[in-house]
Design a protein with these regions (language model features):
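An acidic/histidine-cluster motif and surrounding catalytic segment
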Residues: 1-100, 104-218
Length: 218
């Protein structure tokens, strides 16, 4: 892969998290990407009109009935942070990038070898490959097995994934973002090819502790 980006805020907490990331097995492979601090964001500014919306239909996603709620400032900042990284991938013509949030701090000891192998053996049409994620049981039936990979329709968490230049280009042209970033990415799955491998190689802090591999069910 060409780049390993870590989304981290320019705050005291962000600095501590970035330092923790530098102390992982990834070390100096990482490039910090300054995230958007949602609390300082003026979402009403005209430049965001066609880029992001605060309201999202939580009900249709959760239980199949319309129920509009507002995204929090943190969720809005997270969405724009990921969008900005995708834009960077396209602008800099990066072939393959890994995108990490700064709380993805636990790694399989063979992380680099596993990820290299995943990239080499991935379906040719991949746009996104999830590395750290959760698949709610209700969505497992929608997955399509392709060799050692599964084509994903719905997932939770976006703290660790690979993205191709083609995939990033697709996403930046699908705005406005009108849901939390993991939900919104999932909603693009009809036209964005999202895959997962049978391995989970990163864990989100406080979500899972020592998981190194998963079975065919989550």
């Amino acid at each position: 892969m060409n780049k390993l980006f870590v989304i981290s805020l320019d705050t005291d907490t962000g600095a501590k998290k970035w330092k923790s990331m530098q102390n992982t097995i990834l070390g100096n492979r990482l490039t910090k990407f300054t995230g958007v601090y949602g609390k300082l964001l003026n979402i009403e500014h005209p430049k965001y009109n066609n880029l992001i919306k605060r309201d999202w239909d939580y009900g249709s996603w959760k239980y199949g009935r319309r129920d509009i709620v507002e995204m929090s400032d943190s969720e809005l900042g997270c969405c724009l942070s990921h969008f900005n990284v995708w834009n960077k991938v396209v602008e800099d013509d990066i072939d393959v990038a890994m995108i990490l949030e700064d709380d993805a701090i636990r790694y399989n000891k063979k992380f680099i070898d596993i990820t290299d192998d995943i990239i080499k053996t991935a379906p040719k049409n991949w746009d996104i490959i999830l590395l750290g994620f959760m698949i709610p049981n209700r969505y497992l039936k929608d997955e399509i097995k392709v060799g050692d990979f599964y084509k994903v329709k719905e997932f939770v968490l976006a703290h660790s994934y690979l993205i191709s230049n083609k995939g990033a280009n697709k996403l930046i042209h699908k705005t406005p973002i009108n849901a939390p970033i993991d939900t919104w990415m999932s909603l693009q799955s009809p036209t964005v090819n999202i895959y997962r491998h049978n391995y989970i190689v990163t864990n989100k802090n406080l979500i899972q502790s020592n998981l190194v591999a998963q079975s065919d069910t989550v």
